[in-house]
Amino acid sequence: MQNLSHKNIALIPVFAGIFFAADDQTVVVTILPQIMSDLMVEVTELDRAMWTITGYLLGYVSVMPIMGKVSDIYGRKFIYIASMSVFILGSIGTALTNSLGILETYSYHDSSYIRNSASYILEISTSLNWVIATRVVQAIGAGALIPVTLAIITDSYSGKERFIPMGITGACAEAGAVIGPLWGGIITQFFSWQWVFWLNIPIGLLVIIGIIFLIPNNRPIKGEMDYLGSVIIVAAICLITLGCAQSGVNTPLLATFVSAGLVFLVAYYFLSKTRNNPILPIDIFKNPQFLAANVLHLFYGASLIITLVTIPLMVNTVLSGTSLEGGLTLLRMTIAIPIGAVAGGWLSKTFDLRLSGYLGLIFCATSLFFMSLWTETINDPAMSFHLLMAGFGFGLLIAPITASAMNSVNSENEGAAAGMISASRFLGMALGIAALAAWGSQKFQDLLLGIDINITELGTPSGNDSAFESQLTQVGLTLFHNFFIVGSILCLIGLIPCILLVKRKRQSNIL
C-alpha cells in the first residue's frame, strides 16, 4: 500500500477531473442565452434549450451505476483515462458548434457523397440538436469519473482514512457544478461561448497525464462484462427521466415513459438472477442501510439542482442582475460546500454517522425556507447568510451518505456500490431539473393568467408599464418561492431515510 502522503498527492488529478467534469453540468446556465442567439433558437423554445442541461445530466447519470463495476473488471486507471478521453471528445464536438464553415469548400467537390456529407454535417453542426448530442457524449465520459474515484479511494485507503477523501470527492463535484455558471459568465465576457468547451481540452489532457504517472494499476477482478444488463439499466434510467420531463405538460406521455422504465427495471431484476457477475448486483439493495443511503441521495440531488438553477435565474430576472452577478451570488454557496464536506467527514469519523446527516438536512431545509421569503429588495447580510448556510448543509451530507453506502457492502461489490451511490444523487438532479423545467413552465403560464394587464402582444402591454413590470416581478417571485419550498420539503423528507444510515463506523477494512 502506498504511503499516506503519496496517496493524497495522487488524488489531486483525480479530484481535478471530477471538478471540471462537474463544472460542465451547469456552465450552460449562463451561456444558454448566447447559445440560443447564436443558433437562432426562439425564447418560446426554452424548454427544448434546457435539454442542453438535462441531456448532460441524463448522460451523466445513465453510466454511473455501471462504471464502478466496469472498473472492477477492466481496472480503475484504464477506465478513468478512457472516460476523460470521451469527455474531451465531446467537448471538441460542442466547441465546433457553428464553427465548421470550412466544410463549405467541399460543396463543389466532384463526389456527390462528399458534397452531401459536408452539407449535412455543416447543417447539423449549427443546430441545437448538435449541442445537445455532443453534450451527452461529454456526460457519458464525465459520469464515470465519480464512481471510479470512489473505487480508487476504497482501494487506496482503509477504515476511517476514507471519510475525508470521500467528502472531498463529493465537494469537488458540488463545487464544480456551482462554479459552472460563474466560469461560463467570465469566459463569455471576453470570448465566444465555444471557448468554454475548448478550454476543457488542455485541462483534460493534464488530468490524464497526472493519472498516468500518479495512480497505480489495480488488479482487475476476473469476470465477464454484463453488456445486456448495462443496456437495460441505461434504458430504464433514460425512460424514467424522459417521463419526468413531461411533468405538468403531457401526463399520458409521462405515464408511458415511466411505465416503460419500470418494465425495464423488472426485466433487469429477472435477468440478474441468471448472471454470475451482474453489472449491478440486486442483493446490495436488500441491505436497508444501502437502500436508505441511495434514497437520501436521490432527495439530496433533487433539492440541490433546484437550488443551483433557481438562484441564478432569480438574480438574473426579478433581481435584475447580470449573468456574472448570478454566478457570483451562487459562488457564496459554493464556498461553504467543501467546508461542510470536510466538517461532515470529521463528524462522521468522530460521532454517529447520522449526526452529520441530520444537521445537513436541517440546515438545508431551513435555509431554503428562508430563501422562499426573499423579495426583490433582499440584500446582505441576510442573503449571504442563507446561501452559506445552504452550502454548508449540502456539504455536511456528502460524507455520511457515501460512507454509509460503502460501509454496507462487501469488497466484491464496492465498485458497483460506488457507481450506484453516485448515480442516485445525479438521478435525483436529472429528475429534479426535468420536472422543474416542465412544471415550472406550466406554473409560469398559470400565474400569468392572473395578471390584469393585457399582455397578448409581448413588449406592448396595455396600461402603465411600471404596473405591468411590478406584477410580472411578483409572478417571478411566486414561482421562485415555490421552487425553494419544494427543495426545503425534499430535505425534510430526507430525514426519514437518514434514520436508517449506518449508526456507527465499523472498525474494519470497509469503513
Task: For each feature predicted by the language model, list its residue ranges.
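Helix-loop-helix hairpins in multi-pass membrane proteins, especially solute transporters
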Residues: M64-L228
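12-transmembrane solute porter fold
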Residues: I9-A16, D23, V29-T30, I53, ...
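Central cavity-lining transmembrane alpha-helices of secondary-active solute carriers
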Residues: T54-G68, I146, L150, L331-G344
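Extracellular/periplasmic helix-loop-helix junction of adjacent transmembrane segments
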Residues: I31-S62, L100, Y106, T126-A133, ...
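Cytosolic juxtamembrane N-terminal segment immediately preceding the first transmembrane helix
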Residues: M1-D23, S37, Y108
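Interfacial helix-cap and linker-helix signal at transmembrane-aqueous boundaries
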Residues: I35-M36, V70-S71, W183-F191, C244, ...
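Hydrophobic transmembrane-helix bundles of small-molecule transporters
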Residues: Q189-L296, Y300-S303, T322, L328-T329, ...
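Membrane-interface helix caps of multi-pass secondary transporters
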Residues: V27-V43, V70, I153, L313-S320
